[in-house]
Amino acid sequence: MITSMALGAVAVASGVSHAGPLRAPATGKIPVAFLISENAQVIDFAGPWEVFDGVHVPGRGATHDASMPFELFTVAPSKDPIRATGGLHIVPDYTFAAAPPAKVIVVPAQGGLGAHVSEAKKWLLEASAQSDITMSVCTGAFVLGYAGLLDGLSATTYFRRLDQFAKQFPQVKLMRGVRFVENEKISTSAGLSAGIDLALRVVDRYFGREVATDTATNLEYEGKSWIV
């Protein structure tokens, strides 16, 4: 079900889900890879990063660390420091060639993949084939589109780039006025803060509504658009 209300010229809506639960391992970490490059939009990756980093699953292990199920790392074309929006400098953890397998892949808006688009596409195709879920935030959907990962699927992106996306990727079923769109293995969110909603949905799919709600509460995040 989609609910919305007018906010100026922009519709604020909940998400659309065509996806079921994800199976979490009984023990061990769920690796989460964040694909970043120059001009990566900070909130697009920092929002989901804080969500996954803040998940606590009571009774999952004997120690506090064991109850924190996600292990996070960044992947980039090289290990040279990148400059994200606002001048934030980040030293990537891995290159495409050296990155370990990930069960969750997060692709934020960014502007530094132009010269590395073939490498990024190759890595995304290989990594997403092994992952449980690949998610984009904002115009990160264009990266998934270029890789062919959205062909024949429903998707969304940043509201100011919807028309451009529709022209570039006519094979994708574009949805407007929604916070996110979930398919079984590929999901996309609208811009900026919508990535937090989609990340919470990933938590919900792995560990259920109670854990996801507790995560949102601990973040003091009052948005409810992730609940579908």
What does each model-found stretch correspond to?
Residues 182-186, 203:
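Phosphate-binding/catalytic loops
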Residues 129-133, 150-154, 185:
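Short active-site oxyanion
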Residues 134-135, 156, 175, 187:
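Structural detector of well-ordered beta-strand residues that form the stable sheet scaffold
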Residues 186-188, 192-195, 224:
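Conserved N-terminal glycine/acidic-rich loop preference
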Residues 1-134, 142-146, 163-168, 174-177, ...:
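Extended, subdomain-level signal for the structured scaffold at the beginning of enzyme domains
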Residues 151-164:
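Short, glycine-/small-residue-rich phosphate/pyrophosphate-handling segment
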Residues 155, 192, 205-209:
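Alpha-helix boundary/capping and short turn/kink residues
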